């Protein structure tokens, strides 16, 4: 039996590690969830994701309630108060229970002397909630994004930035990819209906289904047998442009966790696929995905800037480069991105993308296809990146995705759509 732990203090410490130490929630959360009961796993996730999604608001409210910020060893208490405020604002947890559990969290973080302070701030918010929220709704913090990112979105999308921000602040839809080697999408939707769930087919991507209500994977018909994979619709869009064929040699570069590797093999089961990623730890998930789906690919650890180290002089018929990026298109799915990224990261990422593109291009056969993709919405990583590549690469030609002046196709996040994603299809002359 799992030891009873204070979830509020665990959530506070996790959020502190993200914001103060730059750690990814996807690395922090799973080990924490192993320490709590199954019924508490979902609540711990909700508290962590929710606080990170609304961090600007919670920070603003605390600053209004306290004369000076908490620093040093008391900083965890700041995040514990955030967890308390989030529960009062956004959950159905009875206020008395939210307060009691949050105040008790002070003992778990070894700050029992601050129980009174935590209780006082939360009760003050309850008394002044209406006035505080009215004032908050006129502040810049209401957009729940860091100012540097807000400025970039406003510059890139003067007409659409608010809808992008609103989409980023919502809970993401759950998209699935139906394995066409097992069932047609319509057949699987009928199985889903029999299981008491409802799904909606994507209009453009032939394998994509959006669940009406997110569900645990073990409840999905045939998940363990490889009939279905959790993958956002926009990520599935890569196959529309890559169009892999049986018998071809195909490179999936920056492949982890393997969603696109396995999609290539569903579309072209007899393709010879090489999946490469720089992160050896994340490559284990590529193996896991291949195993669950009963597929085979050559999996290698390697740096995209130095392809000769892992593929020699080999050339490929098609290359999918899902480039390392700011991930500003998937904020609704990973709200910690807002607080992990910095403005200075963008030119550094653009430089890295440029180096990988230049290094991998010679490994594409003449007449071959390279699809450049990112889960970013920032032009520096997307249209401007491809525009510069076309200008310096004489044998590269843009195909089907945009114009040389405005290259690529940009998806923006939407409530019933996929994540923010960019694609450019390039042909080697």
Curated annotation (Swiss-Prot):
Its EC number is 2.1.1.176. It catalyses: cytidine(967) in 16S rRNA + S-adenosyl-L-methionine = 5-methylcytidine(967) in 16S rRNA + S-adenosyl-L-homocysteine + H(+). It is found in: Cytoplasm. S-adenosyl-L-methionine binds at residues 254-260, 277, 303, 322. It comes from the Bacteria. Specifically methylates the cytosine at position 967 (m5C967) of 16S rRNA. HAMAP family: 16SrRNA_methyltr_B. This is Ribosomal RNA small subunit methyltransferase B. It comes from Escherichia coli O157:H7.
């Amino acid at each position: 039996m799992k030891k009873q732990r204070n979830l509020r203090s665990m959530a506070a410490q996790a959020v502190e590690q993200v914001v103060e130490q730059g750690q990814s929630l996807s690395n922090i959360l799973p080990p924490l969830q192993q320490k709590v009961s199954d019924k508490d796993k979902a609540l711990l996730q909700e508290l962590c994701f929710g606080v990170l999604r609304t961090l600007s608001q919670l920070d603003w409210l605390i600053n209004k309630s306290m004369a000076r910020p908490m620093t040093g060893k008391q900083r965890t208490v700041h995040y514990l108060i955030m967890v308390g405020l989030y529960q009062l604002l956004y959950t159905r947890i009875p206020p008395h229970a939210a307060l009691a559990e949050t105040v008790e969290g002070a003992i778990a973080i070894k700050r029992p002397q601050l129980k009174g302070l935590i209780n006082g701030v939360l009760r003050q918010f309850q008394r002044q909630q209406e006035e505080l929220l009215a004032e908050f709704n006129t502040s810049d913090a209401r957009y729940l994004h860091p100012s540097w990112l807000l400025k970039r979105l406003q510059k890139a999308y003067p007409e659409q930035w608010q809808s992008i921000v609103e989409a980023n602040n919502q809970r993401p839809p759950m998209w699935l990819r139906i394995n066409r080697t097992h069932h047609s999408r319509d057949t699987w939707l009928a199985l889903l209906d029999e299981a008491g769930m409802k799904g909606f087919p994507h209009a453009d991507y032939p394998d994509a289904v959006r669940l009406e209500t997110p569900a645990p994977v073990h409840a999905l018909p045939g998940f363990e047998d490889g009939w279905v994979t959790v993958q956002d619709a926009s990520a599935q869009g890569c196959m529309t442009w890559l169009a892999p064929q049986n018998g071809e040699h195909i490179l999936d570069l920056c492949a982890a966790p393997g969603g696109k590797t396995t999609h290539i093999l569903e579309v072209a089961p007899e393709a010879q696929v090489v999946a490469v990623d720089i992160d050896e730890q994340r490559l284990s998930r590529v193996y896991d995905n291949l195993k669950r789906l009963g597929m085979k690919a050559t999996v290698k650890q390697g740096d995209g800037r130095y392809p000769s180290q892992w593929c020699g002089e080999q050339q490929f018929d098609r290359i999918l480069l899902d480039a390392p990026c700011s991930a500003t298109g998937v904020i609704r799915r990973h709200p910690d991105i807002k607080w992990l990224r910095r403005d200075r990261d963008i030119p550094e990422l653009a430089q890295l993308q440029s180096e990988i593109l230049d290094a991998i291009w010679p490994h594409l056969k003449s007449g071959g296809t390279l699809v450049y993709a990112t889960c970013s919405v920032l032009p520096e990583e997307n249209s401007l990146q491809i525009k510069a590549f076309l200008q310096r690469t004489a044998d590269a030609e843009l195909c089907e995705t945009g114009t040389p002046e405005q290259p690529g196709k940009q998806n923006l996040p939407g409530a019933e759509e996929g994540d923010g994603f960019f694609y450019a299809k390039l042909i080697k002359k």
